[in-house]
A protein has these predicted regions:
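Catalytic His-Asp charge-relay segment
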Residues: 36-38, 162-163
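Extracellular/periplasmic catalytic domains that process cell-envelope and extracellular macromolecules
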Residues: 29-31, 59-61, 78, 154-159
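Bacterial N-terminal signal peptides
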Residues: 6-17
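C-terminal cap of thioredoxin/glutaredoxin-like
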Residues: 121-214
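A short beta-strand-turn-helix
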Residues: 20-35
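Positively charged n-region of N-terminal signal peptides that target proteins for export
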Residues: 1-5
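Domain-level signature for proteins that mediate thiol-based redox and metal-cofactor handling
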Residues: 9, 20, 65-67
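Structural alpha/beta surface segment adjacent to cysteine/selenocysteine redox centers
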Residues: 38, 43, 49-125
């Protein structure tokens, strides 16, 4: 009984330490953007597929970038390999990599470890891109996926999709996790307003106050 209690206390302390030591430095817009959407995703995750159209539409509506990190969960049997293929297509062009992720989400129920390669070949043919017999001979793209996953671990990601609206504002919290996706647009509105407001405050000259002598 005592050993079990000690184990529980140790686990709680470890979780608390992890929570306080999370690194959120990755939660920021790319250079040149004031506001962006950051998403940690798994290509085999049904909820990621459900969220994808909303995220794309929000990015288009507000003309803001989406920064995606591959976070393939160990319980899924083809998401890591699909993410590696995605990094290969990213190396050809970012829009092509984004289109591959869209393809995976749209065809998710029919994809399996056995037919992932044939799906990648079909996608490549549709987009007039060559798919080499060995996609990642040196493990470079697998390394990129692992690096994305490591970023997620440092942030403290526990599930997919995890979505943030991030900004470059100088004051207050520069990122907000979108827990309720129905509030995505209102969170973006608020973040854009706060970002523009903080910039205006920072640029507004401070008037000198003259104190009258008695």
């Amino acid at each position: 009984m005592l050993s079990r209690l000690i184990a529980v206390v140790a686990a709680v302390m470890l979780l608390a330490t992890f929570s306080y030591s999370s690194d959120t430095s990755a939660l920021k817009p790319p250079p040149g953007a004031k506001v962006a959407i950051v998403e940690f995703l798994d290509l085999q995750c049904p909820d990621c597929a459900n969220a994808n159209p909303l995220i794309k539409e929000a990015a288009k509506t507000y003309n803001i970038p989406v920064v995606r990190y591959d976070f393939p969960l160990p319980k899924h049997n083809w998401s890591f390999d699909a993410a590696v293929i995605g990094k290969y297509f990213d190396s050809k062009s970012k829009p092509l990599g984004a289109a591959w992720r869209d393809y995976c989400f749209e065809n998710q129920p029919a994809i399996s470890p056995e037919n992932l390669r044939s799906n990648a070949e079909r996608f490549a043919a549709q987009n007039k891109v060559t798919l080499p017999f060995v996609i990642d001979p040196e493990g470079k793209f697998a390394g990129q996926v692992k690096a994305d996953f490591a970023v997620g671990q440092r942030v403290g990601i526990e599930h997919t999709p995890t979505i943030y609206v991030v900004s470059n504002k100088a004051y207050g919290k520069p990122f907000v996790e979108v827990v309720d996706r129905s509030k995505l647009y209102s969170i973006i509105d608020q973040m854009k307003s706060e970002t523009d407001g903080s910039r205006a405050s920072a640029e507004k000259p401070v008037k000198a106050t003259r104190v009258a002598k008695k």
